[in-house]
Amino acid sequence: MREKYQVLVLPYRYIGSEIQYALLKRQDMGVWQGIAGGGEDFDKTPLASAKREAKEEMNIDESSTYIVLDSIASIPSYHFKNHQELWGKETYVIPEYCFGVNVKEDILQLSDEHTEYKWCSYDDANKLLEWDSNRVALWELNERLKNDIC
């Protein structure tokens, strides 16, 4: 069963000293975002959900290094199918927990939920992202990586 939270995972890699971020283009909405998905009742923690979603959506190895970000957004529940049946009429927002993941793979496999992905600089990624919550998490991750505070 779908749990009452969302996860956002921002894949990143180093090319020399440059940091690049992978963005995915959603098949259903045509917008750019990080890896996003919901917690399931079998996930023990939001980090476990993040690892599962990253594996499902981009085939990122679960042993990859994850950074737990301080950024937490509130997502209106109406964005989720059957939200009232899942969580009741009194649930108006759910939290979105954010993570970065260091990707070693050169080529990532996309799930059917996305049409393409691209590696971007921070500035390019910031311009492409659709959602403010993604931009805030990207900013935090970029600052942590630039300042080596992970």
State where each predicted segment sits.
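Short, well-ordered beta-strand micro-motif
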Residues: P11-R13, K25, C98-N102
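Generic C-terminal helix-cap and adjacent flexible tail
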Residues: E143-C150
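Short coil/turn motifs at secondary-structure junctions
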Residues: Y14, M29, K104-D106
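Conserved Nudix-box catalytic region and its N-terminal flanking loop in Nudix hydrolases
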Residues: E18-S63
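Short aromatic/basic micro-patch
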Residues: Q33, V93, W119
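NUDIX/MutT-family hydrolases
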Residues: E96-W139
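Active-site segment of metal-dependent pyrophosphate-handling enzymes
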Residues: N59-D106
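Conserved N-terminal beta-strand and adjoining loop/helix that marks the start
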Residues: M1-Y21, F42
